[in-house]
């Protein structure tokens, strides 16, 4: 698959397909969106929000969550605020999210089946990494949105004037429901 993508990319560049996407690094709407990496949202999310290339910083991860105050999603939001001029943040989870059903037991079984040893997992635990917490999903989407919004709003590095709001998008219709 990657080779096909590389071939397509050569053609894209040769025909100057990039020209309609040219913009700078600063989001025109001074907006950051934290959302899930679900494939159903790849085109639906920006279309449903009326966003085009250059409008917003879109940060995606499994579940659209901030799981700790200093994880990579939070780092990206801090960079967006201080380096890129973001003034508003939307946390956008979605209906029927697979992260809702993630379980450490499933991941553990799959990792062992694919060659990760118990010794490796023990080493990770001894380094202070809680794989149960890191790989466990959430049980309730609205609660996870509220928790992520609260983590962002109360972060010691997030200025008080930054607007942070939480939503759930219907992964079929694109309809937004404001949670907080």
Residue ranges and their predicted role:
Residues 1-29, 64-72, 81-84, 99-180:
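Divalent-metal-activated hydrolytic enzyme cores
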Residues 26-40:
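N-terminal low-complexity or amphipathic/hydrophobic leaders
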Residues 30-33, 56-57, 87-90, 165-166:
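Structural motif
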Residues 38-40, 95-99:
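Gly/Ser/Thr-rich loops at beta-strand to alpha-helix junctions
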Residues 46-51:
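Short Gly/aromatic-enriched secondary-structure transition segments
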Residues 57-64:
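A short, structured active-site edge motif that brings together acidic residues
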């Amino acid at each position: 698959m990657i080779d096909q993508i590389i071939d397509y990319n050569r053609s894209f560049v040769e025909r100057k397909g990039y020209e309609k996407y040219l913009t700078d690094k600063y989001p025109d709407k001074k907006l950051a969106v934290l959302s899930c990496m679900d494939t159903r949202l790849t085109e639906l999310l920006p279309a449903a929000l009326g966003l085009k290339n250059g409008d917003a910083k879109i940060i995606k991860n499994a579940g659209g969550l901030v799981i700790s105050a200093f994880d990579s999603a939070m780092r990206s939001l801090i960079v967006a605020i201080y380096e890129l001029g973001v003034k508003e943040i939307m946390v956008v989870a979605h209906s029927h999210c697979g992260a809702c059903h993630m379980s450490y037991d499933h991941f553990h079984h799959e990792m062992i089946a694919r060659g990760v040893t118990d010794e490796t997992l023990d080493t990770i635990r001894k380094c202070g990494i809680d794989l149960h917490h890191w790989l466990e999903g959430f049980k309730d989407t609205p609660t996870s949105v509220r928790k992520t919004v609260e983590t962002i709003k109360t972060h010691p590095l997030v200025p008080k004037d930054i607007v942070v709001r939480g939503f759930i998008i219907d992964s079929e219709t694109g309809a937004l429901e404001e949670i907080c």
